[in-house]
């Protein structure tokens, strides 16, 4: 292999591509690795941002603007059934937090995600219990035992939480409230893209490489490791581990040559 680097020429028997993906271009991310793969005839799968915050349509974002900085426990489900139980964070651009970052890797443009904002509570049963013990307690104060005050105030302004006591809350209103808080369907406008994405989905097709050495099956001496490959993990260090593990496998193979 011959490389031209700033006017210098370097020759090597083996070439290892560890250039990463497209995430966080401000740190120097480029499509260099994908271009090398394509130059040698390897298949590169379509790329997109992963582990990335959602942006929201303007109308919904305006409704939720007072919630920026509010974090809640949640479960979030993609249309393919993938579910994560993590914290969700409202931001000035849309939705973030571990729950959203995780589900973003399973979301496709145009799809909805479904959010349960009270995953640790049987909300219908909780309201019934509170009504039996404190019938004159306001619905707002009852929900404040489970949700942040700012979220309750926002939902009140949007007409999602009636300004009533528990004994005044009728069954239709209660069911609508429970559905709003446990089955909130959101259609993201998109994501924040590679600028803030922690990983890149897609990349060099793993079928093109040896799973033992990371060497291209049909191009001897050419190796790909880390995020440039079509391998994406969850939050929690899995992507770091993949980078280290694939590098170790490649290094072992090179040492044995």
Language-model features, listed with the residues they occupy:
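Conserved beta-strand-loop-beta-strand element in the redox core of flavoprotein oxidoreductases
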Residues: 1-10, 15, 72, 78
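Short hydrophobic core segments
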Residues: 9-26, 37-38, 88-93, 222-224, ...
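Glycine-rich loop(s) and the adjacent beta-strand/alpha-helix scaffold that form part
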Residues: 14-60
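A conserved FAD-binding loop/helix module that cradles the flavin
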Residues: 22-40, 231-257
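Glycine-rich nucleotide phosphate-binding loop and flanking beta-alpha elements
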Residues: 22-25, 97, 107, 212-213
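Glycine-rich phosphate/pyrophosphate-binding beta-alpha loops
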Residues: 23-24, 53, 91, 95-98, ...
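An anion/pyrophosphate-binding glycine-rich loop and adjacent beta-alpha core
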Residues: 42-48, 52-172
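A glycine-rich dinucleotide-binding beta-alpha-beta segment and adjacent secondary-structure elements
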Residues: 153-232
């Amino acid at each position: 292999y011959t490389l031209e680097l700033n006017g210098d020429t370097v020759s090597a028997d083996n070439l290892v591509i560890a250039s990463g993906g497209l995430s966080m271009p401000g740190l120097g991310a480029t499509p260099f690795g994908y271009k090398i793969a394509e130059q040698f005839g390897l298949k590169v799968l379509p790329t997109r941002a992963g582990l990335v915050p959602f942006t929201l349509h303007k109308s919904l974002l305006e409704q939720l603007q007072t919630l920026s900085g509010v974090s809640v426990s949640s479960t979030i489900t993609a249309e393919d059934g993938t579910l994560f139980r993590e914290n969700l964070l409202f931001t000035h651009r849309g939705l973030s937090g571990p729950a959203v970052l995780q589900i973003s890797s399973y979301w496709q443009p145009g799809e909805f995600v479904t959010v349960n904002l009270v995953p640790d509570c049987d909300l219908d049963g909780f309201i019934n219990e509170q009504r039996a013990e404190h019938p004159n307690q306001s619905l707002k104060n009852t929900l404040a035992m489970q949700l942040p005050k700012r979220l309750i105030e926002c939902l009140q302004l949007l007409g999602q939480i009636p300004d009533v006591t528990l004994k005044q809350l009728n069954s239709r209103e209660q069911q609508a409230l429970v559905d709003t808080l446990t089955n909130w369907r959101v259609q993201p406008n998109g994501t924040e893209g590679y600028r803030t994405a922690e990983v890149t989905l897609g990349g060099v097709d793993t079928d093109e490489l040896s799973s033992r050495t990371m060497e291209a099956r049909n191009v001897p001496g050419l190796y790909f490791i880390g995020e440039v490959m079509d391998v994406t993990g969850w939050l929690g260090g899995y992507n770091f581990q993949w980078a280290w593990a694939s590098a170790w496998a490649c290094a072992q193979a090179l040492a044995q040559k």
